[in-house]
Amino acid sequence: LVRGITVSCDVYFYQLGERMDLEDYYSYSKLWGLPKRTHIDIPNEAGGLVPNTEWYDKNYGKGQWTKGIMLNLAIGQGEVLVTPLSLLCFICGIANGGHYAVPHCVKAIGNDGEEAENEPEFIDMPMSETTLAVLQKGMRGVVEDEEGTGKAARVPGYEVAGKTGTSQNPHGDDHAWFVCYAPYDEPEIAVCVLLENAGHGGAVAAPIAGQILRYYFAERDGGTVAMP
């Protein structure tokens, strides 16, 4: 599984999908918050979609779909919908060891010279230490291993963990995804890049994420980064 994540091997995940039950897939996705809204302080936030048996029966009819749909779902395609923010929260949960903070646009509110900061609210992502370790190691390999699909997000002096994604689009060119966090051992920052109709995640989105990380660490460390 670690190598499957690192090299983004669809065939490996197809085989996992064949062995999975749709309801288990749905339950774990829901448990980890992927189809839910993040509750960021912006009105009309869109939710995601992870289909289950009831959804397929309603939209395709009972007996009109097969277990073959698991091949698409196993690589996050087909009917699966996630927002960049919900995916970023999921990645933060992996980086933090199984929990993430509810995102906010506003850090603090001032009134008459006083400032009141938002109290962080954390969401648990129930996940075993073994599962977390596998995901973290696989994502580190995506960026740091020579065979990784996200090498373009490397940052000199820091280890980065990430995951590339390429969403097929029936109406045009593929959508390019990349999510990451850094430093690997003591995470401080997480990034999600989505470029619609732009191509492959490793080739297009990962370099942008790497540039964002380089700016972040340069500013933190008092240095500068040249424009690409």
Feature roles, as predicted:
Residues L1-V193:
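Beta-lactam-recognizing serine transpeptidase/beta-lactamase-like catalytic domain environment
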Residues T83-C89, V204-Q211:
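Short amphipathic alpha-helical face segments that pack within enzyme cores
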Residues E114-I123, I208-P228:
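Short, gly/Ser/Thr-rich active-site loops of penicillin-recognizing serine hydrolases
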Residues G199-H200:
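Short beta-strands and strand-coil junctions in structured, solvent-facing domains, enriched
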